[in-house]
């Protein structure tokens, strides 16, 4: 159930953190660890559960499962699970860099938060993202950011820690909203080759999804002021 899942996730995060503390994790591993920590805090707040207590309970659940699991069954389970790949458009510095907005706008679409600076006008912008893929489709978005040619961050799509879980269609919709909002101010927006390959599959030659003018206008108008 929801509580048990949260407890197990807390314990597994604790194990991964111990691994990272020994300086054994690579950049994608550490990035995912930070994202998962935010997600667990949000879920704990929503469920009204203490993370430390949940971690202990999760340890008991995992230990019980391992006691019942044979080595052969473990090998079969691992072999049957499809492996996902982690793809990076952005460097760790680009992902962790703070950025500021002169005219902040924000919209929540499902479990994704879309932010942009509507003071940006007449710029060439590219969307970059770090995400995992499975079966050649986007599985989980870690972070998407919009960059100007000068390297300034002017927009962002990120998962909400309190609402984990999203589909590739959710990501497509969020990207469409972000593009619509940026194009409203006469910016030219492109999508990175990696995003084109795994998230869009049908795009214009300029590297972005086709959006009818009315749809772009509607998307731009639906972006509400940031609280």
Swiss-Prot record:
Record keywords, A-Z: Eukaryotic host gene expression shutoff by virus, Host cytoplasm, Host gene expression shutoff by virus, Host mRNA suppression by virus, Host nucleus, Host-virus interaction, Inhibition of host innate immune response by virus, Inhibition of host interferon signaling pathway by virus, Inhibition of host PKR by virus, Inhibition of host pre-mRNA processing by virus, Inhibition of host RIG-I by virus, Inhibition of host RLR pathway by virus, Interferon antiviral system evasion, RNA-binding, Ubl conjugation, Viral immunoevasion
Region (PABPN1-binding) location: 220-227
InterPro entries in the cross-refs: NS1, NS1A, NS1A_effect_dom-like_sf, uS15_NS1_RNA-bd_sf
Primary location: host cell
Motif Nuclear localization signal: positions: 31-35
GO CC list: host cell cytoplasm; host cell nucleus
GO biological process, any: symbiont-mediated suppression of host gene expression
Motif Nuclear export signal location, chain numbering: 134-143
PTM note: Upon interferon induction, ISGylated via host HERC5; this results in the impairment of NS1 interaction with RNA targets due to its inability to form homodimers and to interact with host EIF2AK2/PKR.
Localisation: Host nucleus; Host cytoplasm
Region (CPSF4-binding): 177-212
Family as reported in the entry's similarity comment: Belongs to the influenza A viruses NS1 family.
Complex formation: Homodimer. Interacts with host TRIM25 (via coiled coil); this interaction specifically inhibits TRIM25 multimerization and TRIM25-mediated RIGI CARD ubiquitination. Interacts with human EIF2AK2/PKR, CPSF4, IVNS1ABP and PABPN1.
Record's function text: Inhibits post-transcriptional processing of cellular pre-mRNA, by binding and inhibiting two cellular proteins that are required for the 3'-end processing of cellular pre-mRNAs: the 30 kDa cleavage and polyadenylation specificity factor/CPSF4 and the poly(A)-binding protein 2/PABPN1. In turn, unprocessed 3' end pre-mRNAs accumulate in the host nucleus and are no longer exported to the cytoplasm. Cellular protein synthesis is thereby shut off very early after virus infection.
Domain remarks: The dsRNA-binding region is required for suppression of RNA silencing.
Protein name per UniProt: Non-structural protein 1
Originating organism: Influenza A virus (strain A/Mynah/Haneda-Thai/1976 H3N1)
Designated gene of the protein: NS
